[in-house]
Amino acid sequence: MMQAYRTECNYRSAARLSPAELRTAAANREILQATALAFDTRRQLRFEIGGAKAVMPFAQCADGAETGAVRDIAVLTRVGRPTCFVIEGVDTDETGQPVYRLSRAEAQRMCKAEYLDGLVPGDILPCVVTHIEPFGAFCDVGCGISALLPIDCMSVSRISSPADRVSVGQQILCVIRNRDPQGRFVLTIRELLGTWAENAAAFTVGETVVGIVRSVEEYGTFVEIAPNLAGLAESCSDLVPGQAVSVYIKNILPDKMKIKLVIAVSYTHLTLPTSLSV
């Protein structure tokens, strides 16, 4: 059976599989998932799969954990969350009941060797945003393997925070930009949002449209009217980044890739279409 590699939380659940199904999955090296129930004093994650106990020793909780490259916090935060793994074997406890041995690290190594290592800059892959920092968003690119989407790779137009473009748990498509010195992917999405000319073609001088304030400077206010398209309006000190406004398109200058705007109305509460609100 050909293994399909996905982001964590998108594998077949092992919770209600029968012992026979679990044996087959183990033999086929199928990646499954289950919710981690605890991180105990023995530094192992505990699960229940198919009505039986299962454990994941710390060294098997992530690729690199065995060499000390993974901190405890990265493992204990899996508690209460779906976690992917392959079944490495089965033991018995003191009462004779089965206890499955699981490895997320092996699932990640398989994902790297058979999927991620075959990708090159320019390839597009599905990702899930796992957490956001001021400098960018970390994304799961497969089996919980993390890659950075820097804030400057999220948009051509100015944004003050990665949260202006993405949210935790959001499924997005990213382009592989390059690899960092540790071999991890660096991602970008701005190329998928269209060029300046492609976005500007949807607008006409004289229109009044809805936009989002992205930056307020002394010399003017930058308003985004499409995910990769922003124009400059007059400076308005009472506006704040993230606020919705309607703007009149005064001029479009393709040769300079600039749009001149005039703020018509500002809004305190306004539900925006997904294309602008992310």
Protein language model regions, located:
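Charged, low-complexity terminal tails
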Residues: M1-V90
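A cross-kingdom feature marking solvent-exposed beta-strand/loop segments within repeated
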Residues: M56-L76, M110-A113, S146-R165, T195, ...
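Hydrophobic, ordered structural segments
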Residues: V75-K112, I124, H131-G136, G142-S146, ...
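Short boundary/loop segments of OB/S1/cold-shock single-stranded nucleic-acid-binding domains
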Residues: E8-R29, A69-I73, R104-P121, P162, ...
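Short aromatic-glycine-enriched beta-strand elements
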Residues: R42-R46, F135-C139, F185, Y219-F222
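Solenoidal tandem-repeat scaffolds enriched in leucines and small polar residues
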Residues: T130, G136-T188
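Structural detector for short beta-strands of small beta-barrel domains
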Residues: A27-R42, T83-G89, P121-E133, C174, ...
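Conserved small/polar residues in nucleotide/adenosyl-binding loops
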Residues: T268-T274
